[in-house]
């Protein structure tokens, strides 16, 4: 029975002259002496001494665990061969192995998350701020034929923006010293325009129109750059000065809109509403994504809408066909150039969705301009019974624009691709309702039909962005039944 006794690990077989139980301390190699000789061996310690002298096990990071000895099966991740993970070099984890017992969920990754999110890239500034030249030129063109009160209000708005720019330049001068001389240039050009306005006759002076557009462009570029730099510098700690500047800016915009409505110029009000709303949209997009696809999206959306508004004012009173074709061609060219320069399939998918959003924006902008034109044409001849349906339809178009803003912010801000298309579909339905009401009361049949068509196209774009499969999954009874059934749990396999 002595041969069946358990032998401690690492101990050799019992010596021939020893006890069968291996307890003879004379020749037992389990307890070598300090001098290395096998003759003078101490007596084996008892249980109490063993427990007191027993060393704790080596830590997990100890090199002993990964040197290929008897514990080599338990090597830590840091000491394993890195060639095992060569297939993970492009998985967004810098080639490191996944942590143990933590499955990777690709759906949790932000699809619009960009690598290297950092500070604002100065190279993108001319691309982003260029649309505002067209916006303010369009507003200036509307003011060119408007009343004196509208011109005075626009002047007050520009002066307020200059004051806000002067305040912002004091904070941004340390980072962007080149923009400080632009303040002086903008002020000189603006007051030169005001002086020319007082001296010359506005309706017959093309030079005045060009100077006014140039002044508006300079103001727009400078003020927006200053605002962005100011908000980027203090977005995490909102100062009282920033809040006051924002309130002043919104108050000036509100005054301009109210003045445009009171002066029986709904077209100017519609242009201003669309311009300022898109300005805010691009501004939020830029803040949420300082570089990369977010900046590209802001640039494309704002440029498309701005050029659409400018084309509608230059090419005629309301030349929707020419405006739509020009903007569609321009957006297609830009997106094709961007997609050809990128080999990433994810980038191409995002650019395709961006093109659909830009197309919906063009349709919505044209519907707003058409609604403003209908309201302006029939404003003087409207009775009290006809005024309420027209005002209701215009409010529906404004709500559709707000829903479009929510769709953009939801998709490009949070990465949620479900609620953005839903908001766009709702905006398209509201636009269709407005066009149907105007078509029912026989108010400018051509423009009403276009608003109805634009709403239908916006709804189709939202449905395409949402996806037919996802719509079936969320709305179909059988898909909901399958989703509600309990599935058997599957064990997790940690395979690399």
Curated annotation (Swiss-Prot):
Claim: Methyltransferase is one of the keywords in the record: no
Cytoplasmic side: 1-123, 169-177, 232-240, 288-295, 339-353, 409-421, 470-496
Pfam families xref list: Herpes_LMP2
Residue segments, region Disordered: 1-108
Domain of life: Viruses
SS bonds (residue pairs): none
Regions that span the bilayer: 124-144, 148-168, 178-197, 211-231, 241-261, 267-287, 296-316, 318-338, 354-374, 388-408, 422-442, 449-469
UniProt modification remark: Can be ubiquitinated by human ITCH and WWP2 on the N-terminus in a lysine-independent manner.
Motif (PPxY motif) on chain: 97-101
Modified residues (Phosphotyrosine): 112
Biological process terms in GO annotation: symbiont-mediated perturbation of host ubiquitin-like protein modification; viral latency
Parts of the chain on the Extracellular side: 145-147, 198-210, 262-266, 317, 375-387, 443-448
InterPro entries: Herpes_LMP2
Gene Ontology CC terms, in alphabetical order: host cell endomembrane system; host cell perinuclear region of cytoplasm; host cell plasma membrane; membrane
Compositionally biased region (Polar residues): 27-41
Miscellaneous notes: In healthy individuals, EBV typically establishes a persistent latent infection in which the virus can be detected in resting, nonproliferating peripheral B-lymphocytes. These latently infected cells express only 2 virally encoded genes, LMP2A and EBNA1.
Family: Belongs to the herpesviridae LMP-2 family.
Protein name in UniProt: Latent membrane protein 2
Gene giving rise to this polypeptide: LMP2
